[in-house]
Amino acid sequence: PKDNTEMLPVAELIERFDLPGVQRANARFDIAKLDWLNFEHIRALPTADFKSQALGQLQAAGLDAACRDADFTDAALALCTDKIKNLNDVAGYIGFFFHDDVVLDAEAAAQALTPENKPHLATLREAYAGLATFDADSLMESLKATAAAREVKNKVLVMPARVACTGSKVGPSLYHLMEVLGQAEVLKRFDAALARM
């Protein structure tokens, strides 16, 4: 429209459509703009609608969210509402929450789960095992303290921790995803990663 409005309800689009206003120049399909528009529509979805559609995507990918309790599933879904550009991305972004065992991306594992990182991840595992409060803030502070004690940068611990928990180099906030997974599950996933290293 002439007022530069970028998102309109379908009824208003129909009402405001003006064929003489359509330019004759060659049209181009802007994928980046489509991604942005999808992102905005996802963010605008009511929570129940987003959950229904996201669960459908997880099910289509062979992931059974029903095997987890509703609070866990809701917390996992909340981590992706402001991040994904397309509902088709849901399973790839948070699917790791619904696997009993981490499915490792080979490239991520080769980069992060190295023999050099094993002592760092083992020390972080012990720090996390000793936490009385297992929330995002406590996890972040514990990681920073562990990195300082080992005289390494935070990223030396962040990437192995992320790959151990998710199998991937990308995904939701590390500290928030670990909070959702819970202490026992994070320690289990760390142990599995350490055994591979």
Language-model regions: role of each:
Residues 1-104, 166-197:
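Catalytic adenosine-cofactor/nucleotide-binding cores of aminoacyl-tRNA synthetases and other
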